[in-house]
């Protein structure tokens, strides 16, 4: 009996997250101790949206060529190419780019769009980012405002930050409770 050898995949270690602020590995931009660096002029102290220098043509992160962004790169595979749309169920685009109007079945829920629950209005059949109804208050259940804007009594609310009733986390003045 001949034994088959199973090919092994070499393990690579990743250096951790890459900071979009300074470009170094090991931390994220929100944890960066260096000043923000402008994407346009590479100077510190301001963002590209606030830059007074003429806008520079940037190179694509995928291929290094100027004139297009990574999402439009002809050299790299389109990450949305295999994406399945939650609205129409077709492959090749995502819901926010969908040109289909109407309530067709499909998507990753096996053809049952009604299983999707909208966090904004509480209805089924769409996601919050596609909601046309408006926001829903988690405190009183009414549509048109969010819980931190609710005018009704907040006795039943429980703060996620301090676990005390009467307010919600956005209005909490207590320090965070460590678990």
From Swiss-Prot:
Cellular compartments annotated: Nucleus
Family annotation (PROSITE patterns): ZF_CCHC (PS50158)
SUPFAM superfamilies registered for this protein in UniProt: Retrovirus zinc finger-like domains
Top-rank lineage group of the source organism: Eukaryota
Record keyword Nucleotidyltransferase present: no
Biological function: Acts in the sexual differentiation pathway. Is required for efficient conjugation. Double-stranded DNA-binding protein.
One Gene Ontology biological process: positive regulation of cytoplasmic translation
The protein's name in its UniProt record: Cellular nucleic acid-binding protein homolog
Principal subcellular localization: nucleus
InterPro entries (alphabetical): Znf_CCHC, Znf_CCHC_sf
Gene Ontology CC terms: cytoplasm; cytosol; nucleolus
Family listed: To human CNBP and to retroviral nucleic acid binding proteins (NBP).
Zinc fingers typed CCHC-type, residue spans: 17-34, 36-53, 58-75, 83-100, 116-133, 135-152, 157-174
PTM note: Phosphorylated.
Keywords, in A-Z order: DNA-binding, Metal-binding, Nucleus, Phosphoprotein, Repeat, Zinc, Zinc-finger
Molecular-function GO term, any one: DNA binding
